[in-house]
Amino acid sequence: MAEIESWRSKAVAQDVVYPDREHLGRVLGQLRELPGLVTDVEIDRLREQYARIADGQAFLLQCGDCAELFSYCNPKQIDAKLKLTLLMSLIVIYGARLPVVRVGRIAGQYAKPRSKPTEKVRVDGEEREVLSFRGDNVNGTGLEERTPNPDRLLSAYFHSAATLNYIRSRLASGLADLHAPRSWSFQHVRSEYLQHEFERIADSISDTLDFIRAVGAEPGGAQASNTLNTVDYFTSHEALMLEYETVLTRETPRGVYDLSAHTVWLGDRTRQLDGAHVEFFRRIRNPIGVKVGPSMKPDELVQLLDTLNPEAEKGRVTLISRYGARKITELLPAHIRAVRASRHADAVIWCCDPMHGNTVPSPGNPAVKTRLFSDIVTELAASLRIHAAEGSRLGGMHLELTGDDGVTECVGGSMELSDADLARKYQTHCDPRLNYEQSLDIAFLVSEVLRARRLGHPHSENDALVHVLARSTDPAAEGK
């Protein structure tokens, strides 16, 4: 296991400085003795499913909070995210006629990369410089909680364990029963066209499920298909905290696995070829993600793949593109061509993150971050189109969302939220997230695009859906 410590000889980007190193050592010793949060068997099952995604035989839906808080570890919020993910996956399955691999940004997504180690805040009318909030597993949001506290790593472990245990119990208890499309409400949809389209898709899904029951696959019956009642659901997070990841990495007869989550990803700030994070990632057998943004050079991307996946194992690396709606057309084709010209052409999974490149200040309050739904849809649609034009395949989408309805953090969508609505229910402590309704908008859009391509008319009815969703940021556009 000495090899898993090899990252210590490299530069650590986004490193956290703990004033009390002895305290940190004691906490890491405790964590080293605790069981892994997931198992190597579960991770290998996900590796098999990722290989099918790389072959075009499945679709990846990876979604959840930007950064979890410990307070999110409660039945209401876990249920909300879990139910939304299951609902979105059912909608995509209907259009794509492909299995959907569900991966949550949950049960460990506590750390938060920052561009600066400190930030300025106003206290009693005066501006003070304090340590930046780095996520609940590092420090707190209160000014008196900004010193990194090793005990928060233990709290992160136990909150992750409780969240994961609750998810497993809910799925085992029938939460994933897929027989509810007729109960879906589309009252939030202001566009008559979109409401009609969403209701049409829901009716079609209901008809399909009625057919399944009619041929003897009724849940609970002798011929029941287990897939109608239970599903696989995997966990993921950005592996920022290498000390934490290392003590939860274990050697088993199958190999070396990071048992903090089923899959982890490299952020745009920690993917240096000669850095500690890449060194750690290349040692573990988990499937891994790599954020690919505007600063990534095509040859650098191929070098990174050579380092992380020297055997070109199918599905081992997911490339999570995040350019921004105004840059994707310029940057994505070159990255696709570089990968297609390499030995990794058939091994990678391409996944679109239409969130991180589209964060902007609110016009009404520049201190508040938001995202325009039109930008999110534009980047996602462009990614689908560019991959098709380049002879590649978009294998999934990576979204920041909350299962809570009525949250107002992103502007637009079928609810036609305006900038003025942000103050109504803006709750994030990190980046703005899609709410329940906006998340369904995305699911319906992707489902329709994949359905049209499956039926051989990729530029027909889905164009109207993309157009209406993209312009729905501006309520005045309706009816033009």
Regions found by a protein language model. Give the residues of each.
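N-terminal basic/disordered segments at the start of proteins
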Residues: 1-59
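Short N-terminal secondary-structure initiator segments
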Residues: 1-8, 46-76, 294-306
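Glycine-rich, charged/polar anion/phosphate-binding loops
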Residues: 45-47, 274-277, 334-335
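A general structural signal for short secondary-structure junctions and capping/turn motifs
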Residues: 50-53, 91-93, 280-281, 386-389
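Short coil-to-beta-strand
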Residues: 56-59, 346-352
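Short loop/turn segments at strand-loop or loop-helix junctions that form parts
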Residues: 61-66, 103-106, 352-355, 400-402
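Active-site-facing alpha/beta catalytic cores
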Residues: 67-68, 72-324, 368-371, 379-380, ...
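Non-transmembrane, aqueous-exposed alpha-helical and coiled segments at domain scale
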Residues: 310, 316-320, 325-349, 356-407
